[in-house]
């Protein structure tokens, strides 16, 4: 086979593919090219506030939604707001996806924690880390309404990124964006 015949075959193949794509219904093309909206719903159990929205857009995180999430995750004692690590929210989306959930209500027990609140908590409980990831805006304690805690723990651990603490007696899971590690608390 000579060079011209090989080129002809390549062009005919590409033309066939292009023709095939052009006759697909627009709805199929839209499904293929449009990413799924990444929506999360949170309820802060300390304030009663609820927030639901798309945290991630096609070109990255939604700055407006992240700002609202920062406010929702604020220190419950001092009312101080701190920028949260956006990767936490991606982690929550992945946890839900692993569980086969969409937009389930995530109950926030603790998001950001100021240094003074953390010091106070350390005096009350030896289980509070001196350099907690909560102080850095890189940790959230939570549970998902209606989902057994052990399933949420397994889903979080399967991601193999960041820390996962399991607190069955206190009824929450801790996730953070630090090094990979797991532990069981009370």
Curated annotation (Swiss-Prot):
It is an enzyme of class 3 (hydrolase). It holds the Pfam family Peptidase_M15_2. Keywords: Cell wall biogenesis/degradation, Hydrolase, Metal-binding, Metalloprotease, Protease, Signal, Zinc. It comes from the Bacteria. GO terms for cellular component: membrane. Residues 1-30 form the signal peptide. InterPro entries: DUF882 (IPR010275), Hedgehog_sig/DD-Pept_Zn-bd_sf (IPR009045). Zn(2+) binds at residues 134, 141, 174. Coiled coil: none annotated. Its cofactor is Zn(2+). Binds 1 zinc ion per subunit. Belongs to the peptidase M15 family. This is Probable peptidoglycan L,D-endopeptidase MepK. It comes from Haemophilus influenzae (strain ATCC 51907 / DSM 11121 / KW20 / Rd).
């Amino acid at each position: 086979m000579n060079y011209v015949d090989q080129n002809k075959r390549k062009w005919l193949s590409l033309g066939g593919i292009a023709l095939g794509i052009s006759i697909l219904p627009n709805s199929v093309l839209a499904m293929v090219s449009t990413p799924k909206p990444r929506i999360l719903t949170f309820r802060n159990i300390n304030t009663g506030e609820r927030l639901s929205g798309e945290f991630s857009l096609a070109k990255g995180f939604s700055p407006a939604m992240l700002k609202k999430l920062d406010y929702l995750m604020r220190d419950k004692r001092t009312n101080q707001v701190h920028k949260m690590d956006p990767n936490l929210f991606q982690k929550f989306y992945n946890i839900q996806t692993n569980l086969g959930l969409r937009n389930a209500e995530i109950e926030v027990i603790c998001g950001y924690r100021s240094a003074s609140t953390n010091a106070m908590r350390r005096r009350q409980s030896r289980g509070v880390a001196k350099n907690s990831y909560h102080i850095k805006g890189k940790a959230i304690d939570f549970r998902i309404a209606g989902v057994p805690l052990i399933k949420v723990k397994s889903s979080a651990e399967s991601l193999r990124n960041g820390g996962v603490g399991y607190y069955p007696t206190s009824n929450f899971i801790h996730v953070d964006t630090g090094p990979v590690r797991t532990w069981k608390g009370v």
